[in-house]
Amino acid sequence: MKLEKLRNLFGQLGIDGMLITSNTNVRYMTGFTGSAGLAVISGDKAAFITDFRYTEQAKVQVKGFEIIEHGGSLIQTTADTVESFGIKRLGFEQNSMTYGTYASYSAVISDAELVPVAESVEKLRLIKSSEEIKILEEAAKIADDAFRHILTFMKPGISEIAVANELEFYMRSQGADSSSFDMIVASGLRSSLPHGVASDKLIESGDLVTLDFGAYYKGYCSDITRTVAVGQPSDQLKEIYQVVFDAQALGVAHIKPGMTGKEADALTRDHIAAKGYGDYFGHSTGHGLGMEVHESPGLSVRSSAILEPGMVVTVEPGIYIPETGGVRIEDDIVITENGNRTITHSPKELIIL
């Protein structure tokens, strides 16, 4: 099914074959979870090329592809495969292949023109299958469980790094392969940093703590943000929290298929601006989510992407005021036929520990 969908794109891409080298797209197309392998796909043939270390693994995981073990030169074996498949215009992933690698392929592939392709497999990944959504739901559940656990762990005097370590350890104990990304734990004045990765700062009473994390599970990512208070926060921070809470709720309530990313972004941005905090919301409302934590479509002021059923996106408005603090709240949602469905379920009302 995936092979045929990719082949159906060949015409509009102006190619008759595709070289897939990025690990994420290789895994999506083949099911291979190792770190050394690529795929060559023509209109009627498909080969997966790897080395001795992964041949047996590939025979188990990769279906519908001829398994080829290269004898020492991956690039030469790839060139030989392209020639045997009769490919004349070979698409390659321009956003992931380095110039050096491109030059190496160009030196040995003589019978085919190398054609840069911006998006091929990524277009297929936009719409998730029911099986993919089930995995994403499980990744989201692991993150939800981790949030519930970390509420029992956080207290004044604990460092942000200790919180991040505990979150990752707990998610792994629940089946996650790893964290989806370098998680954010930003407390006190550091919560005004939208991407304030965990530091050695100690959490203090009265701090707001922004936790942005996710579980990487069976090749898919969850991505959740909650902001909690450790001790009583100031009235200003409570006000900011309520504005973000209401903006995020508007987004989750009204995002639906047929809407552009820009229209989805406006749902949260317009509310924050109306409350006087527009200058303090400087990032997009959300992004696509799947095998990578940041995928298309974007929910931003510049996005003309049309939301479709089966897409999975985040909704994560925030307010960040230097020398004061910040708040972000984020959920993962699946676009449905009539609206959307939330797959992260951690409480969003302000929690004061």
Curated annotation (Swiss-Prot):
Keywords from the UniProt entry: Hydrolase, Manganese, Metal-binding
Enzyme Commission (EC) number: 3.4.-.-
Database matches in InterPro entries: Creatin/AminoP/Spt16_N, Creatinase/aminopeptidase-like, Creatinase_N, Pept_M24, Pept_M24_MAP, Peptidase_M24B, Peptidase_M24B_aminopep-P_CS
CDD domains linked to this entry: APP-like
Cofactor comment text: Binds 2 manganese ions per subunit.
GO molecular function: metal ion binding; metalloaminopeptidase activity
Amino acids binding Mn(2+) 2: 212, 223, 330
Cofactor: Mn(2+)
Amino-acid positions noted as binding Mn(2+) 1 in the UniProt annotation, renumbered to this chain: 223, 287, 316, 330
GO biological process, one term: proteolysis
Protein family per UniProt: Belongs to the peptidase M24B family.
Name listed for the protein in its UniProt record: Uncharacterized peptidase YqhT
Organism: Bacillus subtilis (strain 168)
